[in-house]
């Protein structure tokens, strides 16, 4: 039980990493929450800071979910039947951390890329197919 609590805390703290907020401070010295939509997420980062910062924030947001599901979950000694459950739990808590981050007043992003990272960690082939489909639709329809 103690290991499960540790996984939950570490996953939440990992999900709470405010990558968009840090990108705004590092690239332009601004608080991203005061610009664009005011959201601390990847979309607002692309809109306000440009594609380079947007790609960096997207990568970190994706990594937060993947890392929690793939590595933090391994703290719990797992039986093969429970590995997916523990990985999903760690990932979901990372998404909650992204949406309600401790480090930035519990106001975060929407969690889509962090959830995508969880999918990459738990069901990588399905995640890659879904992301590929999304990108094809995005670039062909521009919507």
Where is each model-derived feature located?
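Cytosolic, membrane-interface loops and tails of multi-pass inner-membrane proteins
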Residues: 22-52, 108
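Hydrophobic residues within alpha-helical transmembrane segments
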Residues: 10, 59-63, 125, 129, ...
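Interfacial segments of multi-pass membrane proteins
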Residues: 46-50, 72-76, 93, 111-141
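Alpha-helical membrane segments and adjacent membrane-interface helices in multi-pass membrane proteins
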Residues: 51-76, 87-99
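Hydrophobic, well-structured mid-protein blocks that either form specific transmembrane helices
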Residues: 79-113, 118
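Helix-coil boundary and interhelical linker segments in multi-pass alpha-helical membrane proteins
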Residues: 1-7, 67-89, 120-129
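C-terminal ends of transmembrane helices
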Residues: 20-23, 97-107, 134-142
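N-terminal signal-anchor transmembrane alpha helix
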Residues: 2-27
